[in-house]
Every structure is written in C-alpha cells, then in structure tokens.
C-alpha cells in the first residue's frame, strides 16, 4: 500500500510545485518572458530595456542575453572578459557584438541627446548611461561610492553614522537595483516622451543652473537626498565626476554635504515632505510620478543620465525596498533623513540614502516627481541660482554646499550663497534632521559661519570640510562674540574692500564665523595657509585685503584640512599677504610652539589680521609684516612702543592696527591681541579699528565666548601672535620664512606637530616677540608690565593649575589667566592669555590629555569641560562634566590620565579638593595600533640623572610596593569589564596610593617610549614633584640636586 500511496501523493504535490514555479517565474524570473513589454504590475521586468532602468529580474542576464549578441544587453555596463560588448562605448574600442547596430545603436544615440540635454551630461550621459548600466551592474560599487561619500563626509561626522548610512545604502542598493530597473523600464517606455520632457527639462536645466539645480534640487528632494546617492551614481558617470567632486567636496567639506543637504534640503525638505508626502503622495507620486516618470525618464534620460545614473544608483539604493518602495521609501527615507540629520555631515551621504530611498518609493517616478517638484520648489533655486545647480548635476551641489553657507547670507541672491540657502533651505528640510544635526554638531554653525566666510572666498569647497568641523565649535562661540561684527569689520577693515564684498554675504554669516573661520581654521589652517600665503608675501598686500580673505578663507580652508585648504590658497590670497606674512612668522613660531602655537597660528591668522593692521601701522614693516610683528619684535622697542601705543592707543593703532592692537595684547595683552585677531574681526565689526581695541579688551571676556569656540582660535592666535613675534625676528625674511613656516605649519597644522617641536624653539624667540609683553624675553616682558610681572612669571615658584602634553608633543603649563609653552631647550615662552587663545574662561581647574591614539586634551572649569585636538576645540563643547564623566561632581584640582596597558584599562584619576580621588575608567575599546604616534620629545625631566634618582628612591620605598600592589589590584580588575565609561567611588588618596602628598596641585602624563606603557606619570604638590608607579600605586618624591628647583627642572627657568 505504501508504494501505491506514494505516487498518488507525488502526483498531487507535483502540480502544486509546478504552479509555484510558474508563479514565481512570473514574479521574479525571465523564463519565457524575454522581450515581453514592460508592466508596472510585475515585480521585475524582462524587456530589453530593463537593464537601463535597473528593473530586470535576477536571471535576465542568464536567460535573455546571449553571450555573442546585443539582444537585451544594450544597457549593460562594460565588464572585462567578454567576447564582445554592447555598452555605449564599445564602438570606440572596436569590441561591439556583431548585432550591436541593429539592437543598440539607436538606443544609445537617442539616449545621448537626452543626456546631452544636460550640458554636463552630454558626455557624461553616455558615460553615465553606460555607467549607469555599469553601476547597476555593481550596485556594490554604487554602494561603495555612497559609503565613500559618506565616509568623506563623515570624516567629520561620526563613523557610526557612516556605518548606518553605508549599510542602508548598500542594502538599498540591492533593492534599489531591482526597483530602479522597474522604473527604468517605465522610463524607457516613456522614453520618447522623455525626450520631449527631457527637452523640457533640459531647458530647465540648461536654461538655468537653477533649473538644473532645481532639478537637482528637485531631484534633490528625492534626488537631493538622492544627491547623496547620486554621488554614487555619479561615479558611474560624469555626474560622478561632478559628484565626485562633490563628494570630494563633501569629503573635503562637510559643507558639501550641506550642499547635498542643500539639494537635500530641498530634497530634505522635500524629502521630509516627500517622506511624509511620499507616503501619501507616494501613491500620487507614483501616478504623478509615473508621468513624471516619463518626464523623469526624459529627465532620466537626460537627468537620468546624469542623475539617472545617480538616480539609478540612488535608485538602486533606494529601491532597496523594491516593493516597499512606498513604505520603504517612506520609512527608509525617514530613517535616512534621520541619519542624515545625525550624520549631519554624512548627510550628504545619508541624504543619499535618504533621497535614494525616497525616490525609490516613488521609485524612479517619484524621483522625477520629486525631482520635478523640488525643482520647482526650488529651494534649490537659489542654489541653482548659483551655478551650483547646474553643476548640481550633483557634484555641484556639494560644492555649493560650501558656498552655500557663506553665501547664505548673500546666498540667496547669490547662488554662491546657495550654500547657505542651501543649507537654509536644505537646512530646513534637511535640517529637518540632518541639517540640524549638523548645526548641532556645530558643524553647521561652523559651516554656517565658516562656511560663509569660506564661500566667500571660494574656499568654499575647501572650507567646506574643514570649516565645518572645526568651526563647529569655535565658530559658534566666536560668532557669539563679536564675531559678527568682526567679520563685518575685521575683514572689512582689512579687506575693507574685498572683505566687504565678500562679506557681503558671507561675511555676515561669516561674521559669525569670520572670526571663527579664521580660528576655525582655526588656528591651524589659518596659519597653515597664512604661512603659505605669507610666503606669498604679499605681505603688504596682505594687509590690504588678504586679510580679509584670509580669515575668510583661511579659516575655512584650513579647517578643512586646514593645512591643505590653506594651501588651497584661499589663504594664499589671504596671505597674499599680510596676514600671512605675519602668520608666517607667527606661524613659524607657532610651529615651534607647535601645536599650540599652531593652533595659535591659525589663530594667528586672525591675529595676523590684527597684526596686519599693525603691520599697517608698521606698514613699512608690513613689508615685513611679519616684520610687523616682526617689527614689533624687530623693533622690540618699537613694538613695545607700538605696544604701548597700541595699548595706550590701541584705538589708533587699532584702527590701523586694530589688529595692531593685538600688539598691545602682546604683553599681557599679547594674548589679547591674539584675541584681537579673533576679536579683530570683531573689531572690524564695530568700527573696525577703533572698536577693535575696545572690543578687544572686552574680548578678553568675550574671549571666553570665543573660548568656547573661538577660543581655540584665539589661543591660536595669541600664540601665534607671540610666536610670530619672535619668529618674526627670525623670520626676517618674512616672505621666505613665511614660506618655510608655511611648510612647517602645514606640517604642524596637519598635525605635523612634530615640526612643532622644532618650532618651539622658534617659539621661544617668540617669547621675545611676546615681546609684546616681554619685549625681549620673559623677564623683560615682566619688567615692562611690573603689575603683571608676578602673575606672568612662570618661574616665581607658584604651583601651576595644570600641565599637559598635547597630542603633537607640545608641553603646556596653565596658571591663573595665562599659559606657557614649555621647551626642553629654552626658557618658557612668553605668557599668553588662556581665554584669548583657548577660548576657555580662566583660571582653569585642571587639564589632561588622554593616553590613546586620538590624544584629545580636556579642560575642566567649574561644571563644564572642553575637548581639544591639540589647540583646536572640538565641535559641540563645552559640555557638562557630570554627563561626560559618568556623574563626576565636585571641585577637581588635578587629573592624571593613565594609559591602557595589557589588562589595565585606560582611565583618568581626578584629584579633588580635600585629599580625595575618584577614578573614571573609559569604555573599553578593542586595541588598535596608533598610526603616527606622538613625536618623541626629550623633556628635561627625562634626563638619566632623574631616572637614576627615581630608581634609588624606589629601592628605598621597596617595602611598600607589595602592600600597595595588593591594595590596588582589585580596583583595576574591577574596571576591565566595563563596556562603557565607569566612575568609581570617591576615596581618600591615601587609601588608594602610597606616598602621595595630601595636596596635589596638578598631575601630568608624559610620553616616554622607554616605559612599557609608553608614559611617565607625575604629580605636583607645591614645590615638590612625584613620580607615580601606576602598577604598584606608589608615588615617589623626586629628590632634586641641590640648587635645582621644580621650576628649573620642569620649566627650564633660568
């Protein structure tokens, strides 16, 4: 019986299976469907144009395209290893299949025109098309691209976002592929209409960048977000290039992302709308889209090529949910948006997905729809206005982004502005999230600020990136301050002309930034640039205008890379002079100081500006601009005089020197001057000059503002200023020197802080420059200002509030309202105001640098903390200590950072008032090898003698070691399980560490390659210092040779 039943069962089952197969075939297979017409109901299509629209069934290639024929292969992208090809460029290489003419020639030619429609696309279109084809082929590539763009963008933003966006984009790319193919089919069907539409669109496109922009923007909507995606598509085609540019830009500048945003913004807006709308509208859109689809198609054709490619990519991505289209899009979109937002920079990237997503829903159609819509919307328009749009092709957009912001001010009118507007608009939409985040990040502000300025300059792109990040923080605060005015003025004065116009728009925004920008570039960049420009030497010119640009640009560019951007040149122009030169000097010293100075430098530029004026004053000097500074320096007396006058009359000088004022700053002021630079911009605002002085002063206070953001810049400046001062003398050759410095600076800026080290020496000379304060040397400075002498004399035996090494190796001491750069071979640099350079309210409670690859520096003041990368404040700070360190409260008097070593996690010990200590263990991350670790620095405390003494002492204390060891081993063990930061209970220092003094005034972690964990740990108590053995939790007092004081050993005091 069993055997008989079996066949019956089988016979019953077979039909079911077959039916399923057939139905599945109908749904997702091309078996028996090759060449059938396009159907919107089908999950995937098998007509011979489905590849163009990326809507082919997975087995289309296997089932419907024979190897040696072009049947069904016209929209394939080129792939190696085939006997013959059918892509649009095969004729060029003589590898077309025999039946290419009958199947594909017409298709490719007709497409071209549409592509052509879009100017850029012309060539691109083919390419794009082919690319598109290719792209589709490798959604992966697309995805990657997307990721890349994201990465670029993200560089600034968090990698996490990046990941999410990439993943979304990649997954979407798959779906996208399918979906897009479907859409493609539609398009293809509608192709003819498309052509018309294309024309229409094209006109749009052509007619105005706007339209294109719009297109893009429109697209932006969908596309906008798309845009992001587009970049990926871009890759395929010209757009890619463009986009590439964009992305690059993006990469270069987060701003770009913004642009993306911009488009996005529209897009975003639209996207947002779209998303909502999408859902709702989606349906409509779908229909509408359909139409648009055709239009879109055309567009697609044209745009398509452009965008299409992008789109396709986008699409690909978006298609993610092939079907989900709607929902997916909606949802996706949203998420994307979110991402976008989060990413803020990534935005672009994300947007991409976002967009992509969105479009998908509509699927291509919506896109068109959107595209269209947005276009109309225009948000872009303004953008488009700018040429950007045209470029929009996509790439452009990003670019605009940058511009966007600055222009924003102007933007509106001016496309340049687009940026801002972009942001503005985009912002809104995008901001929706993205934007906002961005701003949140600061970036935005930064961008805003920075951006603006930057754009002003053209920097745009460059700034874009840098700008954003850096500016972020700085920017904002700074702007807070007078920034605004500054831009107005500062720039103005100097650039008066240039600036103004520039400012016209940017400036304003810039103002916000202006200063900042400069700082933003902050320091680094600025100097960097300056330097270079400086070399330019234009010194003189510099004052004239450069300055302006400089700030504008420098900042931006610099920020981007600072260094690089700088080169970009914006700076250059800037340097063009003046500034630069000064910076040069400054710069150099800065390097010396290096890092800090560097930042300083960056700052410097600003100061430079101030300086500039000074030079102005010095004018002749100007030539020596640096000299100016130099001059001051050179003529120490002169400078001093200047100083004084400056101080005295800062106003007058100010006017001229507004920046000069800087000078006054010199002594104490020096920092101020620095500030001034920063402020300077401010100043300009006011009266520019006159105000400057005044402002400047306030600046000090403002400084804090700045501080937050600007400060760093300020810092930089001051440092720079000082440095430059000194340097200047050295620099005498200003221009040349400048150039040299520039290199250094670049290096420094780049972080080549290493150069910094060498720099420090320069710095010291700077000290002389500090001349402002210390005309010839510290002591002198002191003499100059007897009232300040004690407070500004690091060697008076008073304990410092904080001592730390920046990531670039610079050793910095903070006490009261001043800080000093320390060098193993020279006396301390002249004092500079903490507020002016770092932008943090002084005096600080403590400072420490993490012992990890990033080497971020943290400043604690009351209930807030700031995080710096070398001397540039990170965006989004200050933050609350209680939130950033697991609930840490109380008055922190010192902090000791401990490196991760074997099973010991990275942590930081906070010493509190009253002899208590609290340990915070960082969240444990996988071990990674640091690339380009800190420069090896030979601090005087590393001398053999000191080590020997420590060893002897160690033997003496031997007995306690085991004991302590046991006491404390449990704590470290406890810590290692953390997967997030963990704050341990507060305990008495004596219960945790052996040999520690009751009062710890400061602590420092010094890099030392001779130690197993790479560091030496020291604690200071009044006039005594202790070497800390972390594993045994023992502190050993260091006995110094007779006549050697802590100041002599640590600060190299005379």
From Swiss-Prot:
CDD domains: HX. Residues 110-764 are annotated as: Disordered. The keyword Secreted applies. Disruption phenotype: Mice are viable and fertile. In the newborn period, their joints appear normal. The aged mice exhibit abnormal protein deposits on the cartilage surface and disappearance of underlying superficial zone chondrocytes. In addition to cartilage surface changes and subsequent cartilage deterioration, intimal cells in the synovium surrounding the joint space become hyperplastic, which further contribute to joint failure. Residues 672-699 have a biased composition (Basic residues). Residues 188-200, 302-318, 364-399, 427-550, 563-614 have a biased composition (Basic and acidic residues). N-glycosylated. O-glycosylated; contains glycosaminoglycan chondroitin sulfate and keratan sulfate. O-glycosylated with sialylated oligosaccharides which are predominantly represented by the monosialylated core type I structure, NeuNAcalpha2-3Galbeta1-3GalNAc, with smaller amounts of disialylated O-glycans. GO terms for cellular component: extracellular space. GO terms for molecular function: polysaccharide binding; scavenger receptor activity. It is found in: Secreted. Highly expressed in cartilage, bone and liver and weakly expressed in heart, brain and muscle. Expressed in the surface chondrocytes and in synovial intimal cells. Isoform B is expressed in bone, small intestine, muscle, testis, heart, liver and lung. Isoform C and isoform D are widely expressed. Residues 317-618 are annotated as: 37 X 8 AA repeats of K-X-P-X-P-T-T-X. PANTHER family: HEMOPEXIN DOMAIN-CONTAINING PROTEIN (PTHR22917), PROTEOGLYCAN 4 (PTHR22917:SF1). Different forms varying in molecular weight have been observed. Such forms are possibly due to different levels of glycosylation and protein cleavage. Homodimer; disulfide-linked. This is Proteoglycan 4. It comes from Mus musculus.
